Amino acid sequence: MGFTKIVVTFFLVVMLAVSSSSQNAMASEIKAKINGLECFNTCTPYYDDYKCNVDCLSSGYPAGDCHIVSPSQPKKCCCY
């Protein structure tokens, strides 16, 4: 009886310690957009909206695609 009581107490203490410890979330953080879009790479026929979106997602942004930033510049991959 004494051994069982010790094992159950130890198990409950371990469960309490694990549940009260801070856990890191596995999801990536989403970066806030500041002053509109965050633009990086130049878009080409090879580097299109899909690849731009994948790069933005892997960088922590919720989405991205190719935008015309100014009329005199080529399209840029912008994350938002």
Curated annotation (Swiss-Prot):
Intrachain S-S bonds: C39-C79, C43-C66, C52-C77, C56-C78
Keywords for this protein: Antimicrobial, Disulfide bond, Fungicide, Plant defense, Secreted, Signal
Signal peptide: 1-27
Source species, domain of life: Eukaryota
GO biological process: defense response to fungus; killing of cells of another organism
GO cellular component: extracellular region
Cell location: Secreted
Pfam families for this protein: Defensin
Family per similarity comment: Belongs to the DEFL family.
Full protein name: Defensin-like protein 50
Native species: Arabidopsis thaliana
